[in-house]
Amino acid sequence: MVANDELLTKYLARNKKAVLGEIIATIQQEQNEVIRKKPQHNMIVQGAAGSGKTTVAMHRISYILYNYEQEFAPEDFYIVGSNQVLLNYITGVLPELNVYGVSQMTMEQLFVRLLYEDWDKSWQIKPVVKGVTPAVKGTLVWFKELENFCLRYEYRAIPREDVVIEKTGKVLLDRATIARLLKETKDLSRADKISRLTDYLMARLENELSGKYYSYTQPEKQKLKHYYETYFGKREWKGSVAELYEQFLKEEQEKDFTVEVPEGGYDVYDLASMAYLYKRIKEDTVIREAGHVVIDEAQDFGMMAYASLKYCLSKCTYTIMGDVAQNISDRYGLNDWMELRKLMLPGEFDYFGILQKSYRNTVEISEFATDILYHGSFPVYPVEPIIRHGEPVTVKKCVDFTEQVTQAEQIIKAWQSKGLDTIAVVCIDEAEAEKVTAALQGSVDLNTGDAGKWEIGEGVMVLPLKYTKGLEFDAVLIFNA
């Protein structure tokens, strides 16, 4: 499984195809260490662009399935990616490792899955729109607000007064004991709290019914058992989780939080909040989900998503891969790992690793990117490019959009004349990508894929920035940089 850098250099000397399997046979030592960590513990890996993070994650799944087959089956894994384009390529890599049957989904799709029957198929998943709302909803402060909302709801929903048998005046469960039990179970779901309280109450009732001080007829015993079996579960939320979430949002608006009630769809932080509310308030039957979750491009998600995920999938372990230098959502993504490490790596044997060797970029590209990163306010992890030189990064200044398009046409044609095949024109978002595609189509043969989809293949592709994560190209033109 371990290979040397000479073999990697040989691979890199060839023209790249936009595939993840390019270095699949070239795993080296620092990657091998990550792959072989025990799956019973959580792991976060900071990996430089081109360090093989995604490939390593897939190898790790294969390694675990082979070496821990008594504990893990393919259906025990969830692979979570930031977009469907990346997941499509993961789908192509896994069969090369003899891995089949592993569920793959975006973070949004995972939270929808965790809503079970409460997800209405008429609802839409929408992208996060830049602005104040996601900057608020993506934080741990927001998650704490959600926790407090649930505590207030549970306080109203779960009886806390003395539980007394009317016939005898016997106190089965006093309010102090109820308060103690609720404190001991404060992090559990409403259903789990009720289950603990009910078990405790029914044990007291059985003791009372079999006692010698009072005599109960058989019908009285049955009536009392029937009544107290549901005593703590009578005030459950009857509406949908969407209605509960709307109630929460309106309470937050009254507290001067700048958030909007979603209309027509939910973004990842809405879905994370709703999944948490479902698990905490509505769930009455625990459904077994994954045993190990692999998250790729982890820096794209705010802490709120991880706090919700940890609560909803509390029995799972995690492999989390990302690069904080590639966070394109600075107001709600991760610019450093500090908070996530505190949340997800509490155990003594949990692991934080760094993949600093980059196999994708030339020395010139790595140095250019690193120089930009040092102008930021967040930690910069070292990048060690494999010794492979290329042309320096070129910056072209243009006066307007028309000149940008003209320059792009000339650059692309020059690259193609050199035999470069897989070329990406990277735009800030979908709207700009559509505009640039329309402008270039008359003079450049573009690989546009299916209408309405962002797909990767050979040729010249115009892509939104978020869909280029983890992919490799012969040449890249960053439009309107």
Where are these regions (language model features)?
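N-terminal accessory nucleic-acid engagement/regulatory domains that precede
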Residues: 1-10
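Alpha-helical nucleic-acid-binding subdomain
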Residues: 65-294, 299-308, 316-317, 335, ...
